[in-house]
């Protein structure tokens, strides 16, 4: 148990009265009083020792519970770490298989240069030969030595005879020799790995520097679209160039500020490059949507870096967040620059195109005006010639129309004569047609009258049959209604008979109890047992020294104020402003009585 601080000690009050002072005075003056008995210090010591043992056992239980909770918490964290490791292992395997398949497909393609393909195949063959040599010279002898040692150990345990001697010194020398060889091999491999990593880091730095130089050059260079276009107005082109330079300088200044911020963050970083790489790899293992992600990766970082404190890791986390935020700002700045550059380029290109179009329009207007004047002269001559031709055409058309009109008048006279003859013939044909039509109508009327009389006879016969059918159906319906009424009466009679039999059966099995108000109002055996009435009190072996009229442990723990304060203390928040504001607002489970309310602090 941790010791409580000065501010965590409970507020205690000591009350004294005149009777206690008189008692002390009597004891000092050795004046006896029949009200008080002499103290049995031996019994008090025994009781005190018993209390000490009980408190020691309780403290031991609390320590065991804390140790158990700590172990369970550690096991839970390890279990969560295992789940994350397994997911990361599966993801890395998938990435590995994907990369291997992509490399194989790339090598199998025919569009790669022969020289590059030969270099890759030779490098792969060289690596496979080196791996086979490593297995043959390093791994296989170790496995053989291990199997030999296991066989010898098993053989000596089974056949432990006094005449069988096991040369352990020779075996230990052989094992030490193998260890030295392995140590030299691993040192050589470590140096080679360090050299390759240095080469890769150097190439990555060169690539990054080259990409940064390209980006800065791209920021400062004029777009190709603006440089390739020609503008007939030099003032407009120079103003566009100056506007682009101002625009670029503003973004370059912002980018330099962000780069300086990144350099400051990188300079203040406390971890080395390798430790930072391990830190980033551990953070990437835990996905963002994982519950308790920060707790898990901080625990894993403390395991990987035991020489670093939690405060140092949190500080490095802050630096990483700042670096990531600055990089995102840099990306957003570059993307905004590209977008604004594209918009500016489009607007500038449109402006230059409009200027070129306006210049071409002016030149074309001047050319068109000159052509118009030439055309006007040609058209005037052509109009005069066309007018003479038109007058001659009009004269000829008038003569032709006069001749055509005479021919049409003659044709019209002939057509009128023919039309009079055709009308006389048509009248004769119409009279003949109406006579035939009238005869057909009379025949159809006679046929319809005969059919009407036949239908009336059939309808009369059908109505007679329908009346007979309705009469039959009515009688059948009345018969069914009578049967239903009889069935309902029979069912009602059966229900009455069934109710009568049930009532007789109920009277046979009815319970007849005597009226006993004393027994009814007295306590039951169960209630007496629960209330402890008429039950002998159990003998309490260890009684307390003094009877205390206070709260028990369960009542104290059940108070929501204490539980909330313990939760804040475990979280380390009991000294914050939030705790100071929220603790007075929590009300107890049972409000205090009005006569017990203190008015000391209300004055």
Swiss-Prot record:
Coiled coil residues, start to end: 365-429, 461-510
Keywords: Coiled coil
Keyword DNA-binding listed: no
Cross-referenced InterPro entries: CCDC148/CCDC112 (IPR039902)
Superkingdom assignment: Eukaryota
The UniProt record lists the keyword Membrane: no
PANTHER family: COILED-COIL DOMAIN-CONTAINING PROTEIN 148, MUTATED IN BLADDER CANCER 1
Name of the protein in its database record: Coiled-coil domain-containing protein 148
């Amino acid at each position: 148990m941790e010791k409580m601080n000065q501010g965590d000690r409970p507020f205690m009050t000591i009350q004294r009265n005149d009777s206690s002072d008189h008692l002390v005075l009597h004891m000092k003056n050795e004046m006896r009083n029949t009200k008080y008995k002499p103290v049995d210090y031996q019994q008090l010591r025994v009781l005190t020792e018993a209390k000490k043992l009980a408190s020691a056992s309780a403290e031991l239980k609390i320590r065991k519970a804390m140790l158990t909770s700590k172990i369970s918490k550690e096991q839970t964290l390890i279990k969560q770490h295992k789940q994350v490791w397994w997911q990361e292992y599966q993801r890395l395997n998938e990435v590995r298989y994907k990369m291997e398949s992509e490399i194989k497909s790339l090598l199998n393609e025919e569009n790669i240069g022969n020289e590059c393909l030969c270099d890759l195949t030779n490098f792969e063959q060289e690596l496979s030969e080196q791996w086979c040599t490593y297995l043959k010279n390093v791994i296989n002898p170790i496995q053989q030595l291990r199997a030999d040692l296991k066989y010898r150990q098993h053989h000596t345990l089974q056949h432990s005879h006094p005449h069988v001697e096991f040369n352990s010194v020779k075996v230990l020398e052989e094992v030490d020799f193998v260890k030295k060889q392995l140590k030299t091999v691993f040192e050589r491999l470590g140096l080679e790995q360090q050299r390759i990593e240095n080469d890769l880091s150097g190439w990555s730095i060169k690539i990054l520097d080259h990409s940064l130089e390209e980006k800065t050059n791209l920021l400062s260079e004029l777009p190709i679209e603006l440089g390739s276009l020609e503008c007939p107005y030099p003032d407009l082109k120079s103003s566009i160039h100056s506007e682009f330079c101002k625009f670029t300088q503003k973004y370059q200044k912002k980018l330099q500020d962000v780069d300086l911020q990144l350099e400051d963050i990188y300079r203040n970083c406390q971890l080395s490059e390798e430790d930072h790489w391990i830190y980033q790899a551990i953070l990437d293992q835990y996905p963002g949507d994982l519950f308790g992600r920060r707790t898990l990766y901080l625990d894993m970082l403390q395991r990987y870096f035991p020489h670093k404190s939690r405060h140092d890791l949190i500080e490095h986390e802050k630096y990483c967040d700042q670096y990531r935020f600055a990089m995102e700002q840099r990306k957003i700045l570059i993307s905004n620059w590209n977008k604004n550059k594209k918009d500016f380029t489009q607007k500038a290109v449109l402006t230059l195109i409009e200027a070129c179009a306006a210049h071409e329009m002016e030149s074309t207007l001047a050319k068109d005006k000159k052509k118009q004047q030439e055309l006007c002269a040609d058209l005037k001559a052509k109009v005069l010639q066309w007018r003479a031709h038109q007058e001659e055409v009009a004269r000829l058309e008038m003569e032709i129309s006069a001749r055509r009109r005479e021919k049409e008048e003659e044709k019209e006279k002939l057509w009128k004569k023919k039309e009079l003859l055709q009308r006389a013939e048509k009248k004769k044909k119409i009279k003949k047609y109406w006579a035939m039509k009238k005869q057909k109508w009379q025949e159809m009327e006679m046929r319809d009258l005969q059919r009407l009389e036949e239908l009336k006879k059939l309808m009369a016969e059908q109505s007679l049959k329908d009346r007979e059918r309705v009469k039959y159906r009515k009688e059948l319906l009345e018969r069914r209604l009578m049967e239903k009424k009889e069935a309902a009466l029979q069912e009602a009679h059966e229900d009455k008979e069934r109710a009568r039999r049930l009532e007789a059966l109920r009277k046979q099995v009815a319970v007849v109890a005597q009226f006993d108000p004393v027994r009814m109002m007295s306590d039951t055996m169960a209630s007496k047992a629960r209330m402890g009435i008429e039950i002998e009190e159990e003998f309490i072996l260890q009684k307390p020294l003094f009877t205390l009229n206070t709260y028990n442990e369960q009542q104290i723990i059940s108070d929501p104020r204490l539980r909330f304060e313990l939760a804040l203390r475990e979280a380390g928040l009991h000294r914050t402003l939030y705790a100071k504001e929220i603790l007075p607002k929590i009300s107890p489970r049972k409000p205090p009585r009005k006569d017990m309310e203190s008015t000391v602090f209300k004055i």
